[in-house]
Structures are given as structure tokens and as C-alpha cells.
Amino acid sequence: SSRTIVYKGMFLVHDLRRFYADLQDPDYESAIGMVHSRFSTNTNPSWMRAHPNRFILHNGEINTIKGNTDAMLAREESISSPIMQDDMNKILPIINTSGSDSAMLDNALEFMVMNGMDLPLAVMITIPEPWENNKNISQKKRDFYQYYATMLEPWDGPAAILFSDGDVMGAVLD
């Protein structure tokens, strides 16, 4: 993306600036910065599975990962996109199942964003707050979650997610 730069390395957070020369430039500025310094918890840790991903930083586990990825795979037979049109088969499969649970969630969000959905909306649909038994939630919000629950299963943790597309940054807990 022209709005984001992703740095990755096997070092402690305080070593990031020493490792990447552009971060040492006093004129280098950014409105948004996110750092993740943990490792895979429910998949085997490896360099390829290490954060960062394109849209999210994730701490926790996606306990529904098998069902989520199976559902996404099943949808691929009938999925269409006004943006991708006849080129849809070039980006399948949507989910790279050799990645970590975080990477697979990032794949799903990337697909939604690249097909025209705003990232905050994609996150709210994918990782909805607990709403069904929440008596303090507004009817408007309840209707929102109920509507989208018919289209996509929640990616449930326990998880804390930080997200950004370079323009906006947000965080959710499931």
C-alpha cells in the first residue's frame, strides 16, 4: 500500500530504529505507528508466521479458525466481486491456510477491503462485540450485528485486535 510501511525483524522493539535506517532520519514522520512483539500461540512459531500483517496486529487466539477458514473456502465457489470481476480466480484462495490464525484473519480482512469495504466495517463484521445477550447494546447496533451475522460467522477469540489501513487506526476486543 502507498499508505503503509510494514517492518519485520527478529529483535526487540527498542532495536527497531537501529535496524531500519529510515527510522533514524529525523525528518521521517508518521501519524500512525503500531508495533507487535509477540509470537504465534496456537500455531507453530516461525519467521513466515510472525507479525506484522497488512492490516492487523493480534494478541490472543482465534479459537474458531478452522470453522472460519472452512466457511471462507466454501464461499469461494459462489463468490463474486464487482471490482475483481472475471479476475476473481487469480486471487483465490482467499485464505492462506499455512499462515497463523492472525494471518488468516488478515487475509479475510484484506479480501473485504480490496473489494471496497472500509476496514473499520470489515473488522466490526468479522470480529463483532458480544451482542446477543448484551442488554446495554442499542437496538440499532443489535440490528447491525444481526444483519451481518447472516453473512459471516464471527472470528472469535479471546483476542485483542489493533487495525490500520494507513488512514485510520482502531482496536477491538471480542
Language model feature labels by segment:
Residues S1-D174:
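Conserved short alpha-helical segments that host acidic/polar catalytic motifs at enzyme active sites
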